[in-house]
């Protein structure tokens, strides 16, 4: 449990084998990650800015949703996005925001926003305690 009253579980996607879209290799754990997301009221996704965009592990998870998870499946769940890099440009931030907000819309999440700095993360944290 975190210091402000919410229990949470952290999943590091690098610890889960998630096959690329279209692959059917043994050991895929996509369903395990999705099951954890279904159990949560709030999903906080985080990614470093990597090669000007969302990192491969998060991007692969998002891509695997397509055609597998019904649109609107996560209706009622809240999604927050933490996106951090050494010196992201406005274009990089805008692209990450677009990708995550579009993902949220397709799958029914209430997209609560993105944080790219400590100050923005604090504002998102406050939003988590409001509802």
PLM features: residue spans?
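N-terminal beta1-alpha1-beta2 submodule of the flavodoxin-like/Rossmannoid cofactor-binding fold
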Residues: 1-68, 105-106, 111-131
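Mid-chain, well-packed structural core segment of small domains
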Residues: 69-74
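Short, glycine-/small-residue-rich phosphate/pyrophosphate-handling segment
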Residues: 75-114
């Amino acid at each position: 449990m975190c210091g402000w009253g919410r229990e949470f579980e952290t999943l590091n996607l690098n610890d889960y084998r998630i096959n690329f879209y279209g692959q059917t290799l043994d050991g895929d754990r996509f369903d395990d990650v999705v099951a954890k997301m279904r159990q949560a009221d709030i999903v906080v996704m985080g990614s470093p800015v990597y090669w000007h965009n969302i990192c491969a592990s998060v991007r692969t998870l998002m891509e695997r949703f397509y055609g597998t998870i019904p649109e609107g499946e996560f209706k009622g769940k809240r999604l927050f996005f933490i996106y951090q890099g050494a010196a992201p440009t406005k274009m990089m931030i805008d692209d990450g925001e677009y990708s995550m907000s579009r993902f949220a819309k397709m799958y029914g999440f209430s997209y609560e926003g993105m944080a790219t700095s400590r100050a923005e993360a604090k504002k998102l944290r406050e939003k988590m305690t409001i509802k």
